[in-house]
């Protein structure tokens, strides 16, 4: 993971360690949105990874889809 992607991943890591354990799992997709975001940052870097993660989170709502949604290659 490049330095920019690492910096962007810090809030996601904070969410996963501190906030996520306090709330029920609400993600409609597999893998979870935070796992998807981390994988997208690792695979695609800061710019495209952030774009993919933002698109995914925007789809994760009660009227959105559900199921398996892996990070594209």
Swiss-Prot record:
- Where is it located? Cell inner membrane
* A Pfam family it matches: YidD
InterPro entries, per the entry: Membr_insert_effic_factor_YidD
Q: Which membrane topology describes this protein?
A: Peripheral membrane protein
Q: Which residues form the signal peptide?
A: none
**Where mainly located?**
membrane
Q: Which domain of life is it from?
A: Bacteria
Name the cystine pairs: none
Single GO cellular component annotation?
Answer: plasma membrane
Q: Provide the protein name.
A: Putative membrane protein insertion efficiency factor
Give the organism, scientific name: Jannaschia sp. (strain CCS1)
Q: What is the lineage of its organism?
A: Bacteria, Pseudomonadati, Pseudomonadota, Alphaproteobacteria, Rhodobacterales
